[in-house]
């Protein structure tokens, strides 16, 4: 609409959060009751059906409705009071819960911190190397707990180890048999408890 009329200035986003209050003729921080009373009066005064010969009445009525809708919704009103119409635009684009995050990340100190970290890491090149290339091409990777570079056991060696372990276990027969249990047998025996595994 503003593009068709060359002399009309495009409406800009405010950060003060006062324009909607001015539309209703209220001061910033007015109560909900004051907003409702003023809205009713202005809506009746500027309703298009009451002013059929005034072409600006419909536009004024839309502005009054918009101001009332935003100022009676507490979430939108808090955003508007804090960030102005720019805050409402951000809430519409990214969601009401992300408005604070957006303004925090677009602050001068967040941008400065982002640039400084970028410069210190060589345009984030070191961060990429740490995550993708195992810490500076492997120079800073954690030391292995096993001696030697790589620990590899071939399947044949593993089978041979299992066979020798089984042969050694054959030399020591099981000498302790389980006791017979019934419903009166206690799971924990009486007397001092010993937690060591040696018999």
Curated annotation (Swiss-Prot):
SUPFAM superfamilies recorded: Chaperone J-domain (SSF46565)
Gene3D superfamilies: DnaJ domain (1.10.287.110)
Cysteines engaged in disulfide bonds, as pairs: none
Presence of the UniProt keyword Mitochondrion in the record: no
Subcellular location(s) of the protein: Membrane
UniProt GO cellular component terms: cytoplasm; membrane
Pfam families for this protein: DnaJ
Residues modified as Phosphoserine: 14, 16
Membrane topology qualifier: Lipid-anchor
Subunit structure and binding partners: Interacts with the chaperone complex consisting of HSC70 and SGTA.
Protein name, as recorded: DnaJ homolog subfamily C member 5B
Organism, as annotated: Sus scrofa (Pig)
Gene: DNAJC5B
């Amino acid at each position: 609409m503003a593009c068709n009329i060359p002399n009309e200035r495009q409406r800009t986003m405010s950060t003060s959060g006062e324009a909607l209050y001015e539309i209703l003729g209220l001061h910033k921080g007015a109560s909900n009751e004051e907003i409702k009373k003023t809205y009713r009066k202005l809506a009746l005064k500027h309703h298009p059906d009451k002013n059929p010969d005034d072409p600006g009445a419909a536009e004024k009525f839309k502005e009054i409705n918009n101001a009332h809708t935003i100022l009676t919704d507490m979430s939108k009103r808090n955003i508007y009071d804090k960030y102005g119409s720019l805050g409402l635009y951000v809430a519409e684009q990214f969601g009401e819960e992300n408005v604070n995050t957006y303004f925090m990340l677009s602050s001068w100190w967040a941008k400065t911190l982002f640039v400084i970290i970028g410069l210190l890491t060589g345009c984030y090149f070191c961060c990429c190397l740490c995550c993708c290339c195992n810490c500076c091409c492997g120079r800073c990777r954690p030391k292995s707990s096993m001696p030697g570079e790589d620990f590899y056991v071939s399947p044949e060696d593993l089978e041979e180890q299992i066979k020798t372990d089984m042969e050694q276990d054959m030399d020591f027969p099981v000498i302790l048999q389980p006791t017979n249990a019934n419903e009166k047998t206690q799971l924990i025996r009486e007397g001092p408890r010993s937690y060591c595994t040696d018999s």
